[in-house]
């Protein structure tokens, strides 16, 4: 939540070569869109209606409207399909699972335990007192967690588009919806209890779930999701993480296109 379109710029190296027409847009509150200071707007329901407004403005229909959402955008894509799938040709959910509680469990009981025990102990000490903005805490996350599970590229080699996109995140929106921790969604974050596992079978449009071996999300659950919808398939990126469109481009775009 709160991120802009810039980290999708990797698509420009692949889609035009296949004559695929595609559109980015910045959600309300992020870089190129207005940023009204109205907390009540930052809800799934609002953003679903925003997608529908964009679709109408572009004149897209069920004959040509393929929606791709990554991470939080995957949540949004699923919710859009549950309300407006008659307007969709197909849905692509990239690097997102259908349950935030399950994501929290995976982050804390699988990925966190892969860290060096002393590093994890120090990270947990800051989380215990909710000191999520501490420079040492952030440094530990960026040094030990991000390079394994967010983007498997050395930090000093991160693409400029990704660096700029992360730098321009609207943090009030991010904190309201996602929360301050990188190990799941915690506190009063509005997405904390989001779970549509029981509704996946309502989705009838062609559905592609994209997951990655080293993702912050459980690739097993992302594959499971593809089997729960009526017409789903799964694309696995064996070398990728949460930003597989950057760190496993060969598999990501070969499977997507």
Q: Model-predicted segments: where are they?
A:
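Flexible "cap/lid" loop of the alpha/beta hydrolase fold
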Residues: 91-133
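Conserved acidic catalytic loop of the alpha/beta-hydrolase fold
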Residues: 45-64
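Alpha/beta-hydrolase
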Residues: 121-198, 205
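Conserved HGGG/HGGXW glycine-rich cap/lid loop of the alpha/beta-hydrolase fold
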Residues: 1-40, 54-55
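Conserved alpha/beta-hydrolase "acid-adjacent" motif
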Residues: 216-221
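Short beta-strand/loop motif that positions the catalytic acidic residue
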Residues: 203, 209-211
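Conserved hydrolase catalytic core segment
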Residues: 61-107
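Catalytic histidine-centered segment of alpha/beta-hydrolase-like enzymes
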Residues: 237-253
């Amino acid at each position: 939540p709160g991120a802009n379109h810039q980290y999708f710029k990797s698509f420009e190296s692949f889609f035009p070569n296949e004559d695929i027409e595609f559109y980015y847009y910045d959600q309300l509150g992020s870089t190129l869109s207005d940023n009204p200071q109205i907390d009540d707007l930052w809800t799934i329901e609002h953003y679903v209606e925003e997608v529908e407004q964009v679709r109408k403005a572009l004149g897209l229909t069920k004959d040509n409207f393929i929606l791709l959402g990554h991470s939080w955008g995957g949540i949004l894509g699923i919710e859009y399909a549950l309300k407006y799938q008659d307007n969709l040709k197909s849905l692509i959910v990239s690097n997102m699972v259908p349950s935030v509680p399950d994501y929290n469990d995976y982050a804390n009981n699988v990925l966190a335990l892969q860290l060096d025990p002393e590093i994890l102990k120090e990270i947990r000490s800051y989380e215990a007192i909710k000191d999520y903005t501490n420079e040492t805490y952030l440094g530990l996350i960026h040094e030990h967690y991000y390079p394994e599970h967010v983007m498997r590229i050395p930090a000093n080699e991160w693409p400029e588009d990704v660096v700029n996109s992360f730098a321009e995140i609207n943090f009030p929106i991010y904190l309201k919806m996602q929360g301050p921790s990188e190990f799941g969604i915690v506190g009063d974050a509005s997405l904390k209890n989001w779970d549509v596992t029981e509704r996946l079978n309502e989705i009838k449009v062609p559905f592609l779930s994209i997951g990655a071996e080293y993702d912050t999300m459980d690739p097993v659950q992302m594959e499971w999701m593809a089997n729960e919808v009526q017409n789903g398939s799964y694309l696995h990126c064996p070398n990728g993480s949460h930003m597989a469109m950057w760190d496993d481009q060969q598999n990501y775009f070969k499977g997507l296109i």
